[in-house]
Structure formats: structure tokens, C-alpha cells
């Protein structure tokens, strides 16, 4: 039994199923690079058969990421598995993850198949997948609600066909720790060839127990892989949180006795990137990555921490990537200093052109904001990377606004559409509403605003505002992000970024439908 816990990240596949979290190929690539930097063992990059956009994203990530195994999901049929294999061809290390439901409810109501048919399809799917790779994972969907005898029969058969990882899915978050942990243990004990595969856990958070169930699967059940997502992102109530699993196992190594190969200093930067791209704000009291995770308000706690940090801190903020809000650069800083700070932050840009564009944005910000923090730099680079990789159908130029107490604000927005400059003017119930009306008056996208969210990147009244806008059109949902010290300007940039995604072809995305 290995003493290492394999971390399988499915942010780009299962996490993307959160309503509104659909990502472009370029956004998936940026997250995949961060996951590789974090030393994630397996990255499930998508579901190749679901769309051309997802296929392309997996194929590109497979060619770019060399230090993590790249995985594609596939239903238990030849067409899906072939598609996954084709997408994974460039990978230096590839895994096909195939699945079929095994619970009576799913077999009868969803698949309309008999248990014998499901058994045969599972067996043949793994056999076919082994033609392309010796790294094959099998998941019995809704495994935690499956008949135990049937589940043992299916899993024994797929291991015999060559499945090297068996993933016990608590698909609807129905499990509780003791029962789920004992389920994994029982399967490993009853299946004669269970020693030929690594057992994995995949839990959802519908009852708020995804992390607890996963850890029980590890400690009680003997699982040696956990499937999880950054920030616990996922449909409904979310998935198992990667950061919580990793830090629980590292902090309580005395109990779990396992090693994880994750570079934990990359956890917070990756959390922030995923939050920015998806528009899902991390709650302040979220374990490990929440803004208050290492804050102490109680006088007794503060006194204890000042005397000895380990009185009230079981892990160090810097170990998971939190940095103090320190002033790092100013308007007199040069390009080399900017580039060096990017390297210190572990941030890379794909080209000199991107670096130059990011530096010009930094200089512009430094002229408007006296103090520049690491968080400002990361926001600049993140937005610049997104702009460089997205085709700008609409491009923000300038904004002016006027408001008086008791009167509707008025906004004037200048922007370019396919290179031709246009000006939109409108009133609204507030400056942001007026700005969006001004843009829509000229563009006429016919989209619906689903979400408007503002986040201060740093502290103080000079802080940059980071705005997320979520738009929907014909059931398609996209996010746009904009940053600026002027909240209304940031709002305009975010709205335009979302419009550009709506304008891009469907096959650039894994199209998410409302």
C-alpha cells in the first residue's frame, strides 16, 4: 500500500459544471498551468466527447502540461472512449476515466438497462480503453447507493479487464463519513483482485460532508486517491475541496500517515485565479483560502498568537500562499523590476508582447494609484492574459459619467466594435446601470444579466475593484471580468469581456446551458 495520497483535480471538468462556471479553452489552459505548478498528480481536463471546445482544450493541455497526468472523462461506450484517446494523444502521461451508473435507480430510470447489460458494458468499456493506455480509471456512478453485491461484481470484472483506478462516486452527496468509509473498506476486502487497483473517492457536498466523507474513505476505507476541485467548485453544493483535503492530510500527518506531493504555496494563487475566471467569489470564512481563514478578532486569540503563533494557528498562512499586503512597486519602477516581481510571484506570460502590454497597464495603474500591491500585479497579468487570448469583438476605450442627487445618472461609453469606434449614451438607476444601458444601446446583444459582483483586490479606498459580470443568451452562460480603480470603468470592462465571449463561436467553449 502506497503511503502517498494521489490528488486528482477535476476543476476543469466537474467544477466547470457549476452554473455559470463554463470556461474558454484559454481559461482552462491558464488553470491547468497553475495546477501543474502546484504539482497536482492528475488533472481531469474535461470531457472530450461533450463538445469540440472541450476536445480542443484537452488536446492543447495534453501537449502543454508535462508534469501531471492528463485525464479525460468518457462514458462507457466506444465512441466516447475513442474521442478521449484522440484528445489525449499529445500527453506525456494520459488517463482515460470511464464511467457508468450502477445504482438501481439510475439503471432503471436513467439508463433503462438491466444490471447484466450494465455489467457487460462496463467490462467492455475498460477493455476498449486499455487499447489506448494502461492508465484507466473506472467509476460506478452513484456508487454509494448501489447494491453492494452487484457493485462488487462489476468492480471485480473491470479490474480483471485492466482498470488501474477504481473511483467510488458519492454522486449526489448522500454519504456520511462512517458509512462511506466502511463502504470503501468493504469493497476492498470483498473484491478478490482489489489489490490490483488504487481505490479513489469522489464526493459531492450536498449535505456539507464532501471533505469529511473523502477523508473517511482514505482513513477507514484505505483509498489512496481523492478527486477534488479548487475552492470546492462544482454543481449544486459543490465537490470536495482540494485545499481542505491537502491541508488536512498535511497538518494531521500524525493521524493519516500519508504524504501529498502538492506545493501548498500555490494553493491561494490558484484559488484566486479560479475565482476570478469563474466569477465564484470565495466566502470569507472558507477554510484555507477564505480572506478570514487566518484572521483573529478575539482579544484572547490575538494575544496568544502574538506570544506564540501555534497557540491558535495550526498551519501558517504563508505555507498555503497567503502574502502580506506589502507595497512592492511604484510609478518609477522599470520593466525589469516588474518582470522580476512576476517571476517571484510565480507568474509567467506566454510572450514578450503580453509582458509589454501588462507592463503598460501597470504603468497606467501606477499613475492613478499611489501604492501597488502583489494582488494588483496578479490582477493586471490575469486580465491581460485573458485579453491576449480572446478575440476582442468589442474593445473598451473610455467612460464618462454624470450624476446628481435626485436625478438618474448618465453615462457615456466610447468603445470599438470590430475596430470602428462608437459612442453610447444612456441613463439608468445608477452609474453601473447607465453604463450597461449605454453599451447595450449600441451593441444590442439581447443578453440577460445574471450576476453582477464587485470585489476589492486590496484594502483602502484606492483599491482596484474587480467586477464579475455573468450574461446569458439563448441559454448560453458566460462570465466577464474587469479591473480598475474606478468601479464603473471596471464594470464596463467586465460587461464588454462577457459580450466578447458571447460573440465567440460555441466550439471555443464547453457550452453551458441555463
Curated annotation (Swiss-Prot):
Positions of the Pyruvate carboxyltransferase domain: 5-268
Class of the enzyme per the UniProt entry, highest EC level: transferase
GO terms for MF: 2-isopropylmalate synthase activity; acetyl-CoA C-acetyltransferase activity; manganese ion binding
Pathway recorded for this protein: Amino-acid biosynthesis; L-leucine biosynthesis; L-leucine from 3-methyl-2-oxobutanoate: step 1/4
Keywords: Amino-acid biosynthesis, Branched-chain amino acid biosynthesis, Cytoplasm, Leucine biosynthesis, Manganese, Metal-binding, Transferase
Compartments (UniProt record): Cytoplasm
Major localisation: cytoplasm
EC number: 2.3.3.13
InterPro entries: 2-IPM_HCS-like, 2-isopropylmalate_synth_dimer, AIPM/Hcit_synth_CS, Aldolase_TIM, LeuA/HCS_post-cat, LeuA_allosteric_dom_sf, LeuA_bact_synth, PYR_CT
Cited PANTHER family: 2-ISOPROPYLMALATE SYNTHASE 1, CHLOROPLASTIC-RELATED, HOMOCITRATE SYNTHASE-RELATED
Membership in a protein family: Belongs to the alpha-IPM synthase/homocitrate synthase family. LeuA type 1 subfamily.
Name of this protein: 2-isopropylmalate synthase
Species assigned in the record: Burkholderia vietnamiensis (strain G4 / LMG 22486) (Burkholderia cepacia (strain R1808))
Amino acid at each position: 500500500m502506497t503511503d502517498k495520497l494521489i490528488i486528482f483535480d477535476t476543476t476543469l471538468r466537474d467544477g466547470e459544471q457549476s452554473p455559470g462556471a463554463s470556461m474558454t479553452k484559454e481559461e482552462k489552459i491558464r488553470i491547468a498551468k497553475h495546477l501543474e505548478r502546484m504539482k497536482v498528480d492528475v488533472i481531469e481536463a474535461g470531457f472530450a466527447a461533450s463538445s469540440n471546445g472541450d476536445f480542443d482544450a484537452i488536446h492543447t493541455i495534453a501537449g502543454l502540461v508535462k508534469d501531471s497526468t492528463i485525464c479525460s472523462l468518457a462514458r462507457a461506450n466506444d465512441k466516447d472512449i475513442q474521442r478521449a484517446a484522440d484528445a489525449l494523444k499529445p500527453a506525456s502521461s494520459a488517463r482515460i476515466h470511464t464511467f457508468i451508473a450502477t445504482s438501481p435507480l439510475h439503471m432503471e430510470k436513467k439508463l433503462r438497462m438491466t444490471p447484466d447489460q450494465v455489467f457487460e458494458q462496463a467490462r467492455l468499456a475498460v477493455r476498449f480503453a486499455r487499447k489506448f493506455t494502461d492508465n484507466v480509471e473506472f467509476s460506478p456512478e452513484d456508487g454509494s447507493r448501489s447494491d453492494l453485491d452487484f457493485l462488487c461484481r462489476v468492480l471485480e470484472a473491470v479490474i480483471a479487464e485492466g482498470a488501474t483506478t477504481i473511483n467510488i462516486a458519492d454522486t449526489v452527496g448522500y454519504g456520511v463519513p462512517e458509512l462511506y468509509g466502511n463502504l470503501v473498506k468493504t469493497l476492498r476486502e470483498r473484491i478478490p483482485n482489489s489489490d490490483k487497483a488504487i481505490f479513489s473517492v469522489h464526493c459531492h457536498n450536498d449535505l456539507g460532508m464532501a471533505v469529511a466523507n473523502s477523508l473517511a474513505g482514505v482513513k477507514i476505507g484505505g483509498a489512496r486517491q481523492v478527486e477534488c476541485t479548487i475552492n470546492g467548485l462544482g454543481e449544486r453544493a459543490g465537490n470536495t475541496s482540494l485545499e481542505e483535503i491537502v491541508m488536512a492530510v498535511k497538518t494531521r500527518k500524525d493521524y493519516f500517515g500519508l504524504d501529498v506531493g502538492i506545493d501548498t504555496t500555490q494553493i491561494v494563487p490558484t484559488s484566486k485565479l479560479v475565482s476570478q475566471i469563474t466569477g465564484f467569489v470565495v466566502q470569507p470564512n472558507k477554510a484555507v483560502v477564505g480572506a478570514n481563514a487566518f484572521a483573529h478578532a478575539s482579544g484572547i486569540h490575538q494575544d496568544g498568537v502574538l506570544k506564540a503563533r501555534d497557540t491558535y494557528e495550526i498551519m501558517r498562512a504563508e505555507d498555503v500562499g497567503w502574502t502580506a499586503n506589502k507595497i512592492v512597486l511604484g510609478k518609477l519602477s522599470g520593466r525589469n523590476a516588474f518582470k522580476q516581481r512576476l517571476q517571484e510571484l510565480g507568474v509567467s506570460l506566454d510572450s514578450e508582447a503580453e509582458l509589454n502590454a501588462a507592463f503598460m497597464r501597470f504603468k497606467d495603474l501606477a499613475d492613478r494609484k499611489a501604492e501597488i500591491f502583489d494582488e494588483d500585479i496578479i490582477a493586471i497579468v490575469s486580465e491581460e492574459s485573458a485579453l491576449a487570448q480572446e478575440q476582442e469583438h468589442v474593445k473598451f476605450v473610455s467612460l464618462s459619467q454624470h450624476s446628481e442627487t435626485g436625478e438618474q445618472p448618465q453615462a457615456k461609453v466610447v468603445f470599438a466594435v470590430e475596430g470602428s469606434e462608437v459612442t453610447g449614451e444612456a441613463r439608468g438607476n445608477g452609474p453601473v446601470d447607465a453604463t450597461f444601458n449605454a453599451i447595450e444601446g449600441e451593441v444590442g446583444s439581447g443578453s440577460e444579466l445574471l450576476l453582477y459582483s464587485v470585489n476589492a483586490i486590496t484594502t483602502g479606498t484606492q483599491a482596484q475593484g474587480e467586477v464579475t459580470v455573468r450574461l446569458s443568451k439563448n441559454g448560453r452562460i458566460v462570465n466577464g471580468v474587469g479591473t480598475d480603480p474606478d468601479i464603473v470603468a471596471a464594470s464596463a470592462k467586465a460587461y464588454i469581456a462577457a459580450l466578447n465571449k458571447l460573440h465567440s463561436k460555441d466550439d471555443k467553449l464547453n457550452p453551458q446551458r441555463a
